[in-house]
Amino acid sequence: MSTKDLEASMRKSLEATQRNFNTIRTGRANSSLLDRISVEYYGADTPLKSLATLSTPDSQTIQIQPFDISGLAAIEKAIAMSELGFTPNNDGKVIRINVPPLTEERRKEFCKMASKYAEEGKVALRNLRRDAIDKVKKQEKDGDFSEDQSRDEQDSVQKVLDKFIVELEKQLADKEAAILKV
């Protein structure tokens, strides 16, 4: 595995962690908060995004405009049952969610959730490093690399990992700052 391939894999892992971060509330309304919500629609779990248009008319409101009005009740139920703690307001045509300001306790909970996502991201990055180092060791064993070349490759793999860990830590710090900002 070349370092470019490794970097591409690690970049994808980092992007997945960033998507997880985007599902955590900050003080502002953001339609990506609803990305993980699935709605039981005609007997199948369907992502909310494929059933409705999501918008944020102001910093404290998320508006959901279903493509099919008959799905309004199912969407409302899915949002109410989610762990986000939102109370949807259904006016018969659209659903509005007022995003209340976060309490200090909720902010701390969300910081813990962000830390958990960051740790999962680090584990994924370390697994990619392990796989890359295993391939290098196999190449050394097969005679494709000398011991010195193998060590150099392993060092370069570690440097790539270190770079991505620093980037992930920065993303975590940014997310925690956004969560704690009042």
UniProtKB/Swiss-Prot annotation:
Subcellular location per the Swiss-Prot or TrEMBL entry: Cytoplasm
Gene Ontology process terms (BP): translational termination
One GO cellular component term: cytoplasm
Top-level lineage group: Bacteria
Disordered: annotated span: 136-156
Keywords for this protein: Cytoplasm, Protein biosynthesis
Gene Ontology terms for molecular function: ribosomal large subunit binding
Family, similarity comment: Belongs to the RRF family.
Database matches in HAMAP family: RRF
Role played: Responsible for the release of ribosomes from messenger RNA at the termination of protein biosynthesis. May increase the efficiency of translation by recycling ribosomes from one round of translation to another.
The protein's name in its UniProt record: Ribosome-recycling factor
Annotated organism of origin: Synechococcus sp. (strain CC9902)
Upper classification of the organism: Bacteria, Bacillati, Cyanobacteriota, Cyanophyceae, Synechococcales
Gene name linked to the record: frr
